[in-house]
Amino acid sequence: MSLLTHLATIDDPRRDINKKHELLDLLFLTVSAVMSGAEGWKDIKQFGDEKLDWLRRYRPFANGMPVDDTIARVVRALDPEQFNRAFLNWVNEVRAASGQEQIALDGKTSAKRP
């Protein structure tokens, strides 16, 4: 399954009236930005502004890029265990498919210890 498929299992904590941006758009943006080095809400927003064309290859972002306060509010409202489970399930699936014992998300390799 793809990252998007795993992220789609996460429940949206918002009421319908407060859903200008799709949850899956926000989650995909946040994970992509953090995996690319973003360290805060403003970094995530900046990544989204700079990479909107790339992000739209995978998700519509029909209402454009959310502001950093929206990103923060929605991510903080998520069930952390549910998010963690979805993300780790995806990582483990990628790891198993690649035949690796572990995956370095920071781009570094680890030396095997004797």
Question: Which residues fall in each region the model found?
Answer:
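Dynamic "connector" segments at or just before major functional cores
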Residues: 1-113
